[in-house]
């Protein structure tokens, strides 16, 4: 994380909100742990995380791994948000998928 923050600052960027990809919860846990452990002060400030998956449409996955695509899962999101120390600021979801509108209303 520090290498990313340093690189971005060297290009004039002072705040970052990096994106995850569509991974298993286990891998996302590791990403959230790294983000939570990061200390701002040198390089660009980590101001949030954009969770790009896994709550995306299986029909429009782009570069994401279809193996990990799933419906919006509020319990999983809460676990990841707790691990990140509240850093998840954006969550990409597929609005046409079952359960997504409830997820949006609740979060």
Where are the regions that the model predicts?
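A short acidic, helix-capping loop that chelates divalent metal ions and anchors anionic groups
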Residues: 57-65
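Short, small-residue-enriched loops and turns at beta-alpha junctions
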Residues: 24-25, 64-69, 97-98
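Divalent metal-dependent hydrolysis catalytic cores, especially in the metallo-beta-lactamase
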Residues: 2-28, 45-57, 84-96
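N-terminal glycine-/serine-/threonine-rich phosphate-binding loop
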Residues: 1-6, 102-106
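A glycine-rich helix N-cap at a beta->alpha junction
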Residues: 37-38, 42-46
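N-terminal hydrophobic targeting/anchoring segments and the immediately downstream early-domain regions
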Residues: 8-11, 34, 38
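Histidine/acidic residue-rich metal-binding segments in metalloenzymes
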Residues: 31, 36, 70-107
């Amino acid at each position: 994380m520090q290498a990313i923050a340093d690189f971005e600052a060297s290009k004039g960027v002072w705040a970052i909100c990096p994106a995850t990809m569509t991974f298993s919860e286990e891998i996302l846990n590791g990403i959230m742990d790294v983000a939570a452990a990061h200390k701002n002060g040198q390089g660009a400030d980590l101001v949030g995380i954009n969770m790009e998956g896994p709550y995306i449409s299986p029909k429009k996955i782009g570069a994401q791994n279809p193996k990990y695509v799933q419906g919006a899962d509020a319990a999983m999101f809460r676990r990841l948000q707790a691990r990140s120390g509240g850093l998840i600021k954006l969550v990409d979801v597929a609005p046409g998928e079952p359960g997504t509108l409830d997820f949006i209303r609740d979060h």
